[in-house]
UniProtKB/Swiss-Prot annotation:
The keyword Transcription regulation applies. Transmembrane segments: none annotated. The lineage of its organism: Bacteria, Bacillati, Actinomycetota, Actinomycetes, Kitasatosporales. SUPFAM superfamilies: lambda repressor-like DNA-binding domains, Periplasmic binding protein-like I. It comes from Streptomyces coelicolor (strain ATCC BAA-471 / A3(2) / M145). Residues 1-54 form the HTH lacI-type domain. InterPro entries: HTH_LacI, LacI/GalR-like_sensor, Lambda_DNA-bd_dom_sf, Peripla_BP_I. Keywords: DNA-binding, Repressor, Transcription, Transcription regulation. Transcriptional repressor of the maltosaccharide utilization operon malEFG. One of its GO terms (biological process) is regulation of DNA-templated transcription. This is HTH-type transcriptional regulator MalR. Pfam families: LacI, Peripla_BP_3. The gene is malR. Residues 5-24 bind DNA.
């Protein structure tokens, strides 16, 4: 056995003690090192112990908000598939109203011995939350990556879409169609993605329509909930202020905006244009098919996994924010402004 350990150690470039830990399934070995030892076994023609055949590299926690918004299951699927390809087993922990909190889910995952955690739209996106919870987690030696949100108080990799650019794409599209009264429906202001969307929206409306920032924020921005009902309420208010187009911070809100327009006897897109955000699964098949700003979910999910595995493997990525560009997808819910039709 000693000769065998020495051969494997030499082939893998690690100590015999490390080889022993891998063969006996002991913790405390980096994923990349474990893979090197298993590869050495294969190269030297040794048969892998039964427990190491198709063995998971470990558990990785994924904490998401409620799954009613279809963008979260889509992102969870991308992350789960990427983890599985790397030999890890994803453990999905979902927050629900009245259910477990993020802190409780984190504690549960740590107790289960996860190798790391990916947070999606968690408390790191809430400017009123205590960010010390993440520093305490880091002190426990648990690597983590934060998706959709940012805080300079947390030393960790962040993965985000460019929310400001998303609003610029949406507003520019609507202005090109002749709309001059464009509203924005989005969630509570304490969330970082909301603040960034407002910044991008206000700046683009200022630049392209010449309105003051004060006027835009006071008359054209409506906060609500990230739900269909929330979008309906916000859009009703904006249409009541003579908006002929509404940009929504999620596709679910956009579906609510379409419902609001119809309940007011208006047609989408003939009377009111609606733009969503996310490009959730099946959103192309709504009536009308929704024009939306596509969140780069595959790229973000894969980057989150890659970054976390670098943290787990001991070669951490920079503790900064990786920002991914969104894409405008034009479908059937936007059209020329009512007053622009028929003009040469």
């Amino acid at each position: 056995m000693t000769t065998r350990l020495a051969d494997i150690a030499a082939q893998a470039g690690v100590s015999e003690a490390t080889v022993s830990r891998v063969l006996n399934g002991k913790p405390g070995v980096a994923a990349t090192t474990r893979q090197s030892v298993l590869a050495a076994l294969d190269v030297l023609g040794y048969e892998r112990p039964v427990r190491l055949r198709q063995r998971s590299e470990g558990l990785v926690g994924l904490i998401t908000p409620e799954l009613e918004n279809p963008i979260f299951p889509a992102l969870a699927q991308v992350i789960g598939q990427a983890l599985t390809r790397q030999g890890y087993t994803p453990v999905l922990a979902t927050q629900t109203p009245g259910g477990s909190t993020e802190d409780e889910l984190t504690e549960m995952l740590v107790d289960r011995g996860v190798a790391g955690i990916i947070y999606v739209s968690g408390l790191h996106a809430d400017t009123t939350a205590d960010m010390q919870r993440y520093e305490r987690l880091r002190a426990q030696g648990v690597p983590f990556v934060l998706v959709d949100g940012f805080s300079s108080q947390v030393q960790a990799p962040f993965i985000s879409p460019d929310d400001r650019a998303a609003m610029s794409l949406a507003v520019t599209h609507l202005v090109s169609l002749g709309h001059t009264r464009i509203g924005l429906a989005l969630g509570p202001k304490r969330f970082v993605p909301v603040q960034r969307k407002i910044e991008g929206f206000v700046r683009t409306v200022q630049d392209q329509l010449g309105l003051s920032a004060e006027t835009v924020e006071k008359e054209l921005v409506q906060h609500s909930l990230y739900t269909l009902e929330g979008g309906q309420a916000a859009a009703s208010a904006l249409i009541g202020r003579d908006c002929t187009a509404v940009v929504c911070a999620s596709d679910m809100m956009a579906l609510g905006a379409i419902r609001a327009a119809r309940q007011l006897g208006l047609d989408v897109p003939k009377d009111v244009s609606v733009v969503g955000f996310d490009d959730s699964p099946l959103i192309a098949f709504t009536d009308p098919p929704l024009t939306t700003v596509r969140k780069p979910v595959p790229a973000m999910g894969q980057a989150a996994v890659r970054t976390l595995l670098e943290e787990i493997g001991g070669t951490p990525a920079p503790h900064s924010e990786f920002v991914f560009m969104p894409e405008l997808v034009v479908r059937g819910s936007t059209a020329s402004a009512p007053g622009e039709r028929g003009r040469p």
